């Protein structure tokens, strides 16, 4: 069964990118922070893809890929780093992110809870081509690990979409520089609809946003009814780790991601409704979200069951003048000119095919390449979500006025590994 645009707010049923340096006249995209200015703008040479075995038999693993454009082995797998036992199979590898100093890679297991396993995995990547698994951790009040926000002095904030039982409320877990969990925020979470998925921050404004997506357990067959999708943005006092405002977007069915606009003096952000196909401009100060673009108007238009093509994850370059997105059902990766945030204009599109299933996207630090993975989530015989994709990894070259697929980079996770087809999801590079 596919997810449907049905939403109810159930009560709880069961027991940072990185900090933006306050530099005068310069603001970097929240998902481009970390390291020195030179590191941020250097073209990466190593690509990491966090993936799982499609058969759910072999260990989850980190694929290390040659990402050096000058290399004759560009696009080839260098090695894999399997997660060691216990708890190393069928975690449903999801998102991952480097620490601010780029020496630690944190990865999430979306469905680790179903097997009683730890769901947050840490790798030492100080030697880029030879990562070393460190350990796995877990929340005490939360689960269903999603996105990571690296902290400037080390550590991470981590969106945990569900409670300890996969229900509501979720939390934002905090890990310190020693990678020890020190808190699960907020101390008094909202009881209704708090299931954080996306996360974005501008510490120089003392501002953080999270986006609520879905009550996780509602996607399982054992829970009657359709998946309970959310449509809301939480505005946080970043320093106090406290929610100060909720922006409800009733028609935005499934607010999977949110991105603050780098350098925007009003601290505005973009989000999109996965099932309504609309892009919203969020004003945290005013507590508003207005429709500024309809993905039904993307050219070429691909007719699919979900309105707007099923827009999922977002990315923004350091300039804050472009918004990139992946449309899972339409099989497209697009770019909008958002130099006027209230009037986005399409400036680029790459069509991968309706069966491709692009989901996760990640810009290189120099904003010149976009990595795309074709897989969202398939709960197989135990759940209602079946969005498989074709398991390919793509590189798209990003120009100011267009997007262009890199024909040299061809990587198919169906055939790349001796253990059999794998599901690629999380993306990072160094």
What are the residue ranges of the model-derived segments?
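Beta-rich, blade/repeat-based domains predominating
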Residues: 34-38, 84-100, 140-154, 190-205, ...
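Short, conserved, GDST-rich strand-edge loop motifs in beta-rich repeat architectures
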Residues: 41-42, 49-56, 107-117, 159-169, ...
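Beta-propeller blade signature
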Residues: 63-67, 118-126, 169-179, 225-240, ...
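Beta-propeller fold detector
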Residues: 73-83, 132-138, 182-188, 244-248, ...
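Blade-loop segments of beta-propeller domains
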Residues: 74-150
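Beta-propeller domains
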Residues: 99, 191-195, 199-336
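Asp-box/WD-like beta-propeller blade repeats and closely related beta-sheet repeat scaffolds
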Residues: 118-204, 212-214, 218
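Loop/turn-rich, solvent-exposed surfaces of beta-rich toroidal or solenoidal domains
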Residues: 305-386, 393
């Amino acid at each position: 069964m596919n997810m449907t645009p049905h939403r109810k707010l159930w009560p709880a049923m069961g027991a940072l990118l990185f900090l933006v340096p306050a530099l005068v006249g310069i603001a970097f995209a929240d998902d481009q922070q970390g390291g020195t200015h030179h590191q941020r703008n250097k073209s990466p040479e190593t690509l990491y893809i966090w993936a799982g075995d499609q058969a759910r038999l072999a260990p989850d693993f980190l694929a290390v890929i040659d990402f050096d454009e000058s290399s004759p082995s560009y696009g080839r797998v260098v090695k894999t780093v399997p997660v060691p036992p216990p708890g190393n199979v069928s975690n449903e590898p999801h998102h991952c992110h480097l620490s601010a100093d780029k020496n630690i890679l944190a990865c999430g297991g979306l469905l680790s809870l179903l097997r009683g396993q730890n769901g947050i995995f840490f790798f030492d990547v100080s030697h880029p081509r030879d990562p070393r698994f460190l350990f796995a951790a877990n929340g005490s009040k939360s689960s269903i690990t999603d996105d990571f926000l690296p902290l400037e002095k080390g550590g991470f904030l981590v969106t945990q979409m569900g409670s300890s039982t996969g229900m509501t409320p979720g939390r934002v877990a905090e890990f310190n520089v020693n990678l020890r969990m020190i808190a699960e925020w907020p101390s008094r979470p909202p009881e209704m609809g708090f299931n954080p998925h996306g996360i974005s921050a501008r510490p120089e404004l003392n501002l953080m946003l999270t986006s609520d997506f879905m009550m996780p357990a509602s996607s399982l067959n054992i829970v009657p009814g359709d998946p309970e999708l959310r449509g809301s943005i939480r505005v946080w006092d970043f320093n106090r780790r406290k929610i100060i405002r909720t922006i409800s977007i009733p028609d935005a069915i499934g607010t999977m991601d949110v991105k603050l606009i780098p350098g925007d003096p009003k601290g505005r952000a973009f989000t999109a409704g996965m099932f309504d196909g609309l892009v919203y401009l969020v004003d945290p100060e005013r507590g508003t979200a207005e429709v500024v673009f309809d993905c039904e108007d993307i050219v070429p238009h691909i007719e699919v069951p979900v309105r707007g093509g099923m827009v999922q994850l977002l990315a923004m370059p350091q300039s804050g003048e472009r918004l990139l997105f992946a449309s899972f059902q339409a099989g497209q990766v697009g770019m909008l000119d958002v130099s006027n945030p209230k009037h986005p204009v399409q400036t680029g599109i790459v069509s991968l095919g309706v069966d491709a299933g692009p989901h996760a996207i990640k810009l290189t630090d120099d904003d010149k390449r976009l990595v795309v993975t074709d897989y969202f989530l398939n709960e197989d015989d135990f759940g209602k979500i079946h969005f498989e994709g074709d398991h390919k990894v793509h590189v798209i070259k990003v120009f100011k006025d267009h997007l262009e697929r890199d024909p040299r980079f061809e990587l198919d996770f169906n055939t790349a590994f001796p253990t059999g087809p794998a599901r690629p999801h999380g993306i990072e590079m160094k």
